Amino acid sequence: MAQKPLRLLACGDVEGKFDVLFNRVRTIQKKSGNFDLLLCVGNFFGSAQDAEWEEYKTGNKKAPIQTYVLGANNEETANYFQGADGCELAENITYLGRKGVFTGSSGLQIVYLSGTESLDEPVPAHSFSPKDVSSLRTMLCSASQFKGVDILLTSPWPKYVGSFGNSSGEVDTKNCGSALISSLAVSLKPRYHFAALEKSYYERLPYRNHVVLQESAQHATRFIALANVGNPEKKKYLYAFSIVPMKLMAVAELVKQPPDVTENPYRDSGKQAAGGKHIPAPQEESACQFFFDLSEKQGRKRPSTGRDTRPPHAKQPRKPPQPPGPCWFCLASPEVEKHLVVNIGTHCYLALAKGGLSDDHVLILPIGHYQSVVELSAEVVEEVEKYKATLQRFFKSRGKRCVLFERNYRSHHLQLQVIPVPLSCCATDDIKDAFITQAQEQQIELLEIPEHSDIKQIAQPGAAYFYVELDTGEKLFHRIKKNFPLQFGREVLASEAILNIPEKADWRQCQTSKDEEEALARRFRKDFEPFDFTLDD
């Protein structure tokens, strides 16, 4: 039975407007049902003494929900918070403390750090120091099974949080916020990080906590900055969300990457000491480089524009290498079963798969001899992409989505397998989950890579790999080291979770006569003709 999610509210600077906040919470709960907790970041109290607070402190008024707040961010409100360990301020209102971890009975783990950054000695009561951040990091990250935390609460924003993300509006994230909090976020990997103080609402695109293809997939982080309560501009100050504690989640579900996930904005900050040193701003780089964090030794930089940046005397793309012997897939080879060919372009051709999973299972193949996508010249890649897009439109018109995979292992000529899956069979997420689940069962590390990534930035020519591309553009990649199951892609697609034809997992069990193959090829050519871009030339 699935774990029931917790329903939480997070709030920005209250600044003494307790009635406004709690009346709003009552309205929300009346409309949407009760929430489990309210988490307040930023300035909970206003600078002046407020009779409104006395009503709550004496019990004349009561918060309608269990509320947890951070400590002071200035001297004026420090007197409301006695001690570093936290305490009850009023019924249903609890001060968490200077720093620490709050773990609820559900297993939800909330890390909190009160105050603003300070390098002064002694550290003011309303501030935190590099030592505070270091002790928090050590306390949590020293555990051998540490994967991250559910929620991080801080009052200041982390510095550079806007890098690689959507616009943060009027807040310049390169010049505001705390570098110490940035480094803490790198270490703690919170699933949600809430902050305030800037009187602005900013929900950043989620960012990843791992380097693609260099580290195992990890959960993404969502950073949300909230405005001040009752602000005249009506900026969002209250954020509702549901969450299942990560300790209760299946790994595949936890590490599932949102479609709009970005690079980690603080990726240089993890290298900083736990001091108040400046974290250098991430350099402007091409998308492919920051997705994979490649050094010059590991991969080539792609130009950041679409223009050809080769020098005037640069070498022209080399011709494809000649096969060492007879090749079943070079179109000029006498070994090719030409009756299976259904379309021929300038650099590539389409052929029905021999022993296909379905009658319209096709292959995209280069006419010349290339072993893998990584080795293709630019003009061949362009036509491969054209075929992929055309096949997607073709299959969509027939009520199907297509899955594409390549296995560059124990093969001599590139074969891009394109398998249509009826829309009625399953959703794209089901296909993705099936690949991930079956990969885990076979100890295959299948990693998600960015949608617009270039395989050439991931694998070097000659490297063995397997990759899957879904109709949404999502891609899964495995770097093959040894003993990869040759039929893995077919086995997943033939499984009960997708096409439900497990008996067809091995192509050799699906072969038909040449007459039948010729009939299928004729039918495909006829059906595909309205989509055939080669006729436009």
Swiss-Prot record:
Residues 297-323 are annotated as: Disordered. InterPro entries: Cwf19-like, Cwf19-like_C_dom-1, Cwf19-like_C_dom-2, HIT-like_sf. Pfam families: CwfJ_C_1, CwfJ_C_2. CDD domains: MPP_CWF19_N. Belongs to the CWF19 family. This is CWF19-like protein 1. It comes from Mus musculus.
